[in-house]
């Protein structure tokens, strides 16, 4: 994650913190941060039903996609530090917009967020940087996918864009691989499935870092 590099951070002065998002991730962040003696107020935007359950925490019913209203509210609340949780606002460049207004932000800019928001971009990044990764093919039509599927024994099928954690499939056979690929390309995940990544299936334990 990227923190605004134009200013040094004095954590003892991070009294008013804003957390962008409305999920369990944001609640977990608020729960951890409210334990700090330095923090006085945590505003979760827009938050959810549990956002006000922790001390120092308050949910604000505000649409963070309206950046003009968001910035006005952040200034009004004298926010010292902003954490952006969800992938979509990061991919859409919210961190970049806030940094241009000289806010201190924890979260990648839209360029860094591409590692999450576009699987094909991330795979090409790894390939160009000689970072070990499974072989892959990028397709935008079922006609392009068929010869790849027919010549491969075992593939993972992935919608290229953000699909709320539901865009990755591990088919059991070629027919299932073809069906899933066609389903994604036909709009199961909207624009997130305009491109499909067909990836070599690797065997072994899965580890997240």
Regions found by a protein language model. Give the residues of each.
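Short beta-strand segments
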Residues: 20-21, 85, 157-160, 199
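ATP-binding N-terminal substructure of ATP-dependent carboxylate-amine bond-forming enzymes
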Residues: 1-110
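Solvent-exposed alpha-helices and their adjacent loops that cap or buttress functional pockets
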Residues: 9-12, 35, 52-53, 106, ...
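Conserved ATP-binding module of the ATP-grasp superfamily
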Residues: 81, 132-134, 155-157, 171-208
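A conserved helix-loop-beta module that forms one wall/lid of the active-site cleft
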Residues: 108-167
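Short acidic-hydrophobic, aromatic-tinged amphipathic segments that line or gate anion-handling sites
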Residues: 58-65, 137-141, 171
């Amino acid at each position: 994650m990227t923190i605004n590099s134009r200013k040094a951070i004095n954590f003892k002065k991070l009294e008013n913190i804003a957390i962008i998002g409305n999920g369990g991730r944001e609640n977990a962040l608020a729960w951890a941060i409210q334990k700090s003696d330095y923090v006085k107020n945590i505003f979760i935007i827009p938050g959810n039903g549990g956002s006000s359950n922790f001390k120092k925490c308050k949910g604000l019913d505000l649409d963070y996609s309206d950046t003009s209203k968001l910035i006005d509210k952040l200034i009004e609340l004298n926010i010292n530090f902003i954490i952006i949780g969800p992938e979509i606002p990061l991919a859409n460049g919210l961190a970049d917009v806030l940094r241009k207004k000289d806010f201190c932000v924890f979260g990648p800019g839209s360029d860094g967020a591409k590692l999450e928001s576009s699987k094909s971009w991330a795979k090409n990044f790894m390939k160009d940087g000689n970072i070990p990764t499974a072989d892959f093919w990028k397709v935008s039509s079922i006609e392009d996918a068929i010869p790849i599927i027919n010549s491969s024994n075992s593939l993972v099928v992935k919608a290229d864009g953000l699909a709320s954690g539901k865009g990755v499939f591990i088919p059991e056979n070629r027919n299932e691989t073809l069906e899933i690929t066609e389903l994604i390309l036909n709009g199961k995940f909207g624009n997130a499935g305009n491109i499909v990544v067909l990836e070599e299936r690797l065997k072994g334990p899965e580890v997240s870092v």
